[in-house]
Amino acid sequence: MPKPIRRIVTGHNAEGKSVFLSDEPSRFEFNVGRGAVTVTELWETRSSPAENFGSEETVDHQFGILPPKDGSIFRIIEYLPDRQRMGEGYDREAAFRAMGAEHALDRANPRHPGFHKTDTIHYVIVLEGEIYALMDEGETLMKAGDVLIQRGTNPAWSNRTDKPC
């Protein structure tokens, strides 16, 4: 089980001064695929440019993999080691269905059951541990501090260690 993610949200008071609106562990944690992946939603925007006034919670819905049209999602994902995550009884169809992403699943790629494609951009930062980023052609090992800019590609993630990433 991952440690709670502290989420601090700022905003404005009635006089337009900057203030802290909340400072607490994120309440929006979702377990996908028998708990093999834990997703912590931190913030969501629903337009661009983002609406920065008001104090409403933006992560107030059921988990889904895609952001709203013209919006963005900031999340932290923890991957268990592959042998735990995709061990006996792993059902990738069910895992992607739980994320509302069965349409993104690449059923034709035999290299890894996690291959999927969306037309979104992802900024992937490894905070702890290590994980392989797999593309249709090639793979690279990412370690803590590494950043990957994923531009509408067909990725899969492989944690070949014995610790979560």
Give each language-model segment a name.
Residues 1-58:
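N-terminal leader/capping segments at the start of a protein or of a new domain
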Residues 64-69, 115-116:
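Short, charge-rich binding segments
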Residues 14, 127, 160:
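Short, ordered coil/turn segments that flank beta-strands lining enzyme active or ligand-binding pockets
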Residues 47-64, 73-78, 86-89:
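Terminal, intrinsically disordered low-complexity segments enriched in charged/polar
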Residues 110-144:
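A short beta-strand-loop-beta hairpin characteristic of the jelly-roll/cupin
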Residues 26, 75-118, 151-155:
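Conserved short histidine dyad/triad with adjacent acidic residue
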Residues 69-73, 80-82, 132, 139-144, ...:
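Ligand-binding loop in jelly-roll beta-barrel domains
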